[in-house]
Amino acid sequence: MPARAGSPAATAEPTGGAIDIAVLLLPRFSLMALASVLEPFRVANRLAGRELYRWRFVGAEAGRVQASSGLPITTGLSVRDPITARRVIVCTSFEPMAAAGRAVLAWLRRLDAAGAELWAVDTGAFLLAEAGLLAGRTVTLHWESLAAFAELHDGVATSRSLFERSGRVATCAGGTAGIDLALTAIAAEHG
């Protein structure tokens, strides 16, 4: 069973080959997008009877981050903490750059340089592009944001797919599209 966010075990490094996931939550993130991308990993752990995936919630600052629905989630870690992860999932709002300061962008660059997979759900692709991590890639994001993204980042191709994978970078359209992305990863990693 995965550790609860904020518990001491949630900040420890994985054991027994569990894939460590850092989930970046920025204010007014989509709770549906978060649940859709995260729940398949929880179910995989349960069905396997062991921890295949471990996740920790990270904020621009440690503390409460409120979803667009008003539900607060406590992040035990901030982007200033020393964090390693095999996979980073970026969960943002319909105004993704509003809470993405220099520290967040530097954190994404640092984890990319360390070889982490970078996943952006919903509008998270805006942050990866702003951090300079999407050049030459094809990405997808929430349909309402496709035109604005294409206008701001003309060097990045966009698609209307549920999700796109390009090397260590994956993007998905938000809503329940995260289920498809996560299930594809689980199938590749554990059959």
Where are these regions (language model features)?
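Residues on a specific face of well-ordered alpha-helices
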Residues: 39, 143, 147, 151, ...
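Short beta-strand and adjoining strand-loop segment in the mid-core
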Residues: 128-143, 169, 186
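Generic secondary-structure signature for well-ordered alpha-helical cores
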Residues: 46, 151-154, 187-191
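A conserved active-site-flanking secondary-structure segment within enzyme catalytic domains
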Residues: 135-165
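Conserved anion/nucleotide-ligand pocket segment
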Residues: 161-191
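Extended, subdomain-level signal for the structured scaffold at the beginning of enzyme domains
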Residues: 1-118, 127-130, 159, 183, ...
